[in-house]
């Protein structure tokens, strides 16, 4: 079984509303606020802002 630590899985969803997303982990203790990061969206072929969403 995996070790239980402060890192949780999150989903980064494109703000271009294409449905594209990335998955990553983040440490909730060090970064309690929602993550926003600029990444490449292959659907629109541009760099756009991705916002954090919960994995269902």
From Swiss-Prot:
Cross-referenced PANTHER family, in alphabetical order?
54S RIBOSOMAL PROTEIN L39, MITOCHONDRIAL (PTHR15238), LARGE RIBOSOMAL SUBUNIT PROTEIN BL33M (PTHR15238:SF1)
Q: Which GO terms describe its cellular component?
A: cytosolic large ribosomal subunit
Keywords in alphabetical order: Ribonucleoprotein, Ribosomal protein
Q: Which Gene3D superfamilies match?
A: Ribosomal protein L33
Q: Which organism is it from?
A: Pasteurella multocida (strain Pm70)
Q: Does the keyword Transferase apply?
A: no
What's the family? Belongs to the bacterial ribosomal protein bL33 family.
Superkingdom of this protein's organism? Bacteria
Q: Which gene encodes it?
A: rpmG
**UniProt name for this protein:** Large ribosomal subunit protein bL33
GO molecular function terms attached to this record? structural constituent of ribosome
Name its GO BP terms in alphabetical order: translation
């Amino acid at each position: 079984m995996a070790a239980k630590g402060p890192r949780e899985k999150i989903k980064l969803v494109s703000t271009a509303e294409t449905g594209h997303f990335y998955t990553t982990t983040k440490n909730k203790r060090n970064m309690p606020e929602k993550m926003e990061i600029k990444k490449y969206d292959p659907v629109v072929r541009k760099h756009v802002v991705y916002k954090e969403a919960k994995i269902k």
